[in-house]
A protein has these predicted regions:
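Aromatic-lined substrate-binding rim segments of carbohydrate-active enzymes
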Residues: 1-53, 68, 75-79
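Polysaccharide-binding and catalytic clefts of secreted carbohydrate-active enzymes
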Residues: 47-138
C-alpha cells in the first residue's frame, strides 16, 4: 500500500495495546499517488476530457477496470493481513458516494459502461426513446 513499510502494523499494535478498537479503512476511495502515477487510466475525466488529478477527492473512475482490479487487490491484501486481528472491529472500504460531483466521468470506460447499461436495460433504441420521452426524430 505504501513505501513506508511497517507503519500500519505499528499503528494497529499501538492502538490494540491501548485497548482501542479499530475501524480499518482501505485507500480505495482515494487511491494513493504512487498508484495513480503508475496507472493513470484509472482517473475520471471531466466533460472536456481533463483528468481529475491526484489531490482531489475520489479521483478514480467507477467504470475503470484498472481501478476495480487495484481496489480489489488492495482490499484483499489489507483483509488478509489484518482480518483476524482482535483490534479490528469494523471495515470501511468507501463512503460518501456522489460527493462533490465525483460520480461523473466521461472516460472511454465510463461511456462504454453507460451504453452497455442502456442496452441491457432497454434493449432497443426505440424502447429507450419511449422510456425517456424522446419523441423527436434526429
Amino acid at each position: 500500500m505504501t513505501t513506508l513499510q511497517g507503519w500500519l502494523d505499528r499503528a494497529v499494535e499501538t492502538l490494540h495495546a491501548a485497548g482501542l478498537g479499530i475501524i480499518m479503512g482501505t485507500p480505495t476511495a482515494t487511491p494513493p499517488k504512487w498508484l495513480v502515477d503508475r496507472m493513470p487510466d484509472m482517473v475520471a475525466l471531466d466533460e472536456q476530457g481533463r483528468p481529475r488529478g491526484f489531490g482531489s477527492r475520489r479521483h478514480y473512475c467507477f467504470s475503470s477496470d484498472v481501478y476495480l482490479r487495484q481496489a480489489e487487490r488492495i482490499t484483499r491484501a489489507v483483509a488478509e493481513r489484518y482480518g483476524r486481528h482482535p483490534a479490528i472491529v469494523a471495515w470501511q472500504t468507501d463512503n460518501e458516494y456522489g460527493c462533490h460531483d465525483t460520480v461523473l466521468s466521461f472516460s472511454v470506460a465510463a461511456r462504454a459502461a453507460f451504453r452497455e447499461w442502456l442496452a441491457e436495460r432497454y434493449g432497443t433504441i426505440t424502447a429507450l426513446n419511449r422510456a425517456w420521452g424522446n419523441v423527436f426524430w434526429s
